[in-house]
Amino acid sequence: MFRRNIITSAILLMAPLAFSAQSLAESLTVEQRLELLEKALRETQSELKKYKDEEKKKYTPATVNRSVSTNDQGYAANPFPTSRAAKPDAVLVKNEEKNASETGSIYSSMTLKDFSKFVKDEIGFSYNGYYRSGWGTASHGSPKSWAIGSLGRFGNEYSGWFDLQLKQRVYNENGKRVDAIVMMDGNVGQQYSTGWFGDNAGGENFMQFSDMYVTTKGFLPFAPEADFWVGKHGAPKIEIQMLDWKTQRTDAAAGVGLENWKVGPGKIDIALVREDVDDYDRSLQNKQQINTNTIDLRYKDIPLWDKATLMVSGRYVSANESASEKDNQDNNGYYDWKETWMFGTSLTQKFDKGGFNEFSFLVANNSIASNFGRYAGASPFTTFNGRYYGDHTGGTAVRLTSQGEAYIGDHFIVANAIVYSFGNDIYSYETGAHSDFESIRAVVRPAYIWDQYNQTGVELGYFTQQNKDANSNKYNESGYKTTLFHTFKVNTSMLTSRPEIRFYATYIKALENELDGFTFEDNKDDQFAVGAQAEIWW
């Protein structure tokens, strides 16, 4: 054995002078290779034991005397009952540095949370999303949603909307970063068991790529901290969450923009995007594509006082029409395109005990003003369900909104969404050109907080709207909703914490329906529904 070791040592010492590393590996016998591996393993185990002993000395609590208790039969009770294995607080990570630390250890400790974050940052990939899904039944057959944008969402939505975002960092060096982002959104039907996209008579199942763009940091010398993006992407959306529509929304086929550009006390978001529309003729049977471009400019996060910020926004939409498109509008009965704009301001106040409230003021003209006049959903689109039509004559509309939530004591929370709007000489999709309208919608949601994971409450919604057409005929639409609910939650906030599972019972009634003629099943003007819904984002 001694002779074999001497020969082996001589071979190992002389090999670098005569052979490459590959040649050495090929010349060693299986026995020699195993001996080298065993030696390396012993050294590693010794180093690991040394580190564990050091950590044990640091964190092992002093021993205490325990009296041995006995059970009812007189036997000694187990002083160390078996328990489920706990998740370790830390993991061992081998240091990259060649020189060991002062203790001589080549390992260091890292918490699982930090280790998980490190791995995610190293990979540079994230998967984010949102969806809702649930079951419901009603007193008159299939449950129906009505006026979600005015009466509120709880117990009044039966869709399966989803958003799925994939983000991959592709470069992050020398103060410059590049990310690729793709987002898909759509709806999965909640009525039939089959969910094939595009193969459903009700049109429930659909999906689109709403975003596909590249965003960067550090490439613009004048705004190194800003997010500069190019591709299919729009300006950030701002939502009235309880009503499920947006106060700020600029959809895009493709564009270029800058977000979070630090200028003065606030930040600038600016986007130039393309958003073509289908321009219809007066029969609403024929259409032509019109190229439109939108500029969306916002100056946000302007500090006012403690926990209060201001945003000022503006949006302008213009068409780039061809000669043939203009000729169709002049001679073939197609609706004329009219430039449209929207501008306004919003103030956000955060509260010391948690919660917030956001107040906004917006004014718009032409087709955006027409969408201010919609009671069901009032996002500032330039079209109605993707179709551009109507005799727009420069009329304007104004909208005032309030939304937020506030804690009252330790066990109560109240969320609200209140909207007042009116317009003059607008095109209404219900009452035509030269219409005036006025509406108010209010939803409040008080709840009792049992603990971090349970709330019981009620959502109360009411709205009323009156339109007056060009002949001064008046049309009224109004209704109310009452929803009792209990929710399983992970935090106490109503508007900013998900996942959430809610159980509800809803009574909803249409008081007047002169704008849309809506009825529930069996031509009823009311509906009682019960159900359960899950909503999650991550």
UniProtKB/Swiss-Prot annotation:
UniProt keyword annotations, A-Z: Cell outer membrane, Ion transport, Membrane, Porin, Signal, Transmembrane, Transmembrane beta strand, Transport
Family statement: Belongs to the porin LamB (TC 1.B.3) family.
Job description of the protein: May be a sugar porin with a broad carbohydrate specificity.
Protein name in UniProt: Putative outer membrane porin BglH
Organism: Escherichia coli O6:H1 (strain CFT073 / ATCC 700928 / UPEC)
The gene coding this protein: bglH
Membrane topology: Multi-pass membrane protein
Localization per Swiss-Prot or TrEMBL: Cell outer membrane
UniProt GO BP: monoatomic ion transport; polysaccharide transport
Record's GO cellular component terms: cell outer membrane; pore complex
A Pfam cross-reference name: LamB
Signal sequence region: 1-25
Keyword Transmembrane: yes
GO molecular function, a single term: carbohydrate transmembrane transporter activity
